[in-house]
Amino acid sequence: MRLLGKISVSTALGLAAAAVAQTAAAADPLKVGLVSFYSGPVSGPVGIPSRNGADIIIEAINNGALPAPYSGKGVGGRLIEPIYVDEAVEAVNEYRNLVQRQGVDAVIGYASSGSCVGIAPIAEELKKLTLFYYCGTTRTFEEGEKQYVFRTMNSQDVENIAAARYTLSVKPNLKTVAGMNQNYGWGQESWRDFIKSVQKLKPDVQVVSEQFPKLFAGQYGAEVTALARANADVIHSSFWGGDLDALILQAAPRGLLKKSTGVLTTGGTALNSLAKQIPDGTVIGVRGTGGALAPASKFNDWFRAAYQKKFGEEPNFPAYYMAQSVLALKAAGDKAAAASKSAPTADDIRKALPGLDFETPAGKVYMDRHKGHQAVTEMAYGTFKLVGGKPTLTNIKRYQPDCVVPPKGSKSLEWIEAGFPGAKCK
């Protein structure tokens, strides 16, 4: 894959152990704001699992109990002091409150792309280390370089390029496509990049319906009727959270996703809760390789076991991705401590993030795009099948970054429209 200036966290962690041991007792805590939807319809599938995932990792970091390759207590010796804030309540104002009144060292958060678009310039203005853990809009880094803002998972362009490739691999004779996406940046960009990718790969595919209900509308009777009449081979949807659940439930009585194959790019959050309503054959994404599509590893086994023990259920992919952001702090902080032989400041951590790679329960993350501020990981999709009453994913395909990630220096839409020059797909 395309990786320039990559710095291995395993090397840094070995050097950091002694420095961490020396600084752990005396270092001030690292105050971290952790923001997601902890109330409302998004809280169940996204916000609460995200918080739970962070809890598991923070507890292990503070106790020095993370699996290899990590070692030592804290972030370069600084224990994490979490402050949880609900994204549902005036996200921009609450961000300012975290920074200016509560004095956090860093902020991890934001599920909604709308939140991230609003907060990114404020983070730069206030010069506060901010890690976006879930929002996917490409605007964050394509509309100007950032110094203080990072994203520790893929952006939506990568998800939808991979979705297009997967869809055509399972439906090579695809003729017609419809879209059901929320009417704001995330939904508009997701549909744009998916359909442009599909049509670049198979130019004869026709769009027969495009539906853009407002975010968190909740009721989709008119849109479901329109999609049923269109009778497309495939319906693409980037709905997430409570909107995704509502769509699945309202589509079920009409058999919409049985007649037309659903391509649900965030469908992994509904696997367990709505398994009986999701038709076999539905294409399921997890926005990377978290949750049900996490690769086998000792780290993943540890995370799943710890999560199940504490919360009594399987971790879904939002739990993985907030955990991933916390691990980015740990990896960068330990690297900075190894270099300075002292507890890292937030600015030390910020400077250690570009070019870093680090291990997570969802696999390796490379801080490689947009001058090291945008993460790169592999992407995975699978096909839903209910087996013995249990949800399973079959025909799983994994896409390496060289196949689905735009090259450095290129904008995603331009790369798609040019026909993915330089892509290396197996």
Where are these regions (language model features)?
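Extracytoplasmic "Venus flytrap"
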Residues: 33-57, 85-89, 111, 180-189, ...
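Bacterial N-terminal signal peptides
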Residues: 8-19
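Short, polar/charged alpha-helical segment
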Residues: 45-72, 192-200
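Solvent-exposed, acidic/polar segments of extracytosolic/periplasmic ligand-binding ectodomains
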Residues: 30, 357-426
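Extracytoplasmic ligand/sensor domains, especially the bilobed periplasmic-binding protein
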Residues: 52, 104-210, 259-284
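Beta-alpha junction/loop-to-helix N-cap segments that form part of ligand/metal-binding clefts
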Residues: 45-49, 64-143, 152, 213-220, ...
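Sec/Tat signal peptide C-region and signal peptidase I cleavage site
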Residues: 19-26
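Extracellular/periplasmic periplasmic-binding protein-like sensory domains
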Residues: 251-324, 334-340, 393-425
